[in-house]
Amino acid sequence: ILMLTLVTENRTPLLGILKGDQIEKTPIGQKAAEEIQKIPTYDGAKSIEIYSYIVMPDHIHILLRIHEKLPIHIGNYIRWFKKQCTDNCRALGVPTTRLFALEYHDRILKGKHQLEHMAKYINDNPRRLALKRQNKELFTLQQDILLNNIPCTTMGNMFLAEYPIKQVIQCSRRLTQEQIDELKAQCLAQAQEGTIHITAAISEGEKQIARALREAEYPIIVLLQEGFPKPDSPHYRYYKPAGVYFEACAKGKLLLVEPHAEVLERSEIITRTEAKIGKIPHDTQRYRFVAMNVVAEMMAGGERES
């Protein structure tokens, strides 16, 4: 199974218009949909089956099921598809050098679970686009935000950072499942009383507790390390969190925070990190993980109790 993503040149929305939570295809988008159906005929052997696809205003997703070894490289199918779409675009009176950008993204899916998950994801694209447009302030990357004097890039509900009662989720990797479950119950009880939790979600225990809070729809602040595209990246403008983080963000229940790279080298953070684990190289995973939890403590306004 192969998932293909193609975007229009300069992300120009020529393929469709969002109406409610559905995409109304333009004539160009309708022609692109028709060309998608023709992809299995390109090699004459019908080695490819179209499992699912979606046409969005400025991009398309296609799920291909490949039944046997292709007689030609998949790139040849894509080039042929893009050429046909560009020809159709010109025939409709829209002058363009090319409809789709030169690059494309492909991803191999393994197993029925990945296939079903990705099919659900691409079919849900219009609804998620509607949510993003309805909640622009929640899906805008904000640069150089200071949280407790820590410079960050953020996305989500900034009001969560201003709430006075915040608690860090921090779990040692040595905790047993029983201990994790006990801490999870404590965090859920705190959240019910109004506490906002902060976590880097690094250890298994931290991930489990963050998941439980999210599933219960309690607000949460999640620290990321190199989680956002850079401002000069072509993906910066179009970034949105994936999966469950997207849903939480749309509901105003999530704040994603990426401390600037130099933050982990601040003297105060180095001192507090080394007090926990001793002096180790700063480029190690261990140092970065513990330092991120120190940053979470500082954003919460102190150190985690217990």
Regions found by a protein language model. Name each.
Residues I1-Q142, L146-I150:
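Short catalytic/metal-binding and nucleic-acid-binding patches
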Residues L141-S306:
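Glycine-biased, small-residue-rich flexible motifs in mid-sequence functional cores and linkers
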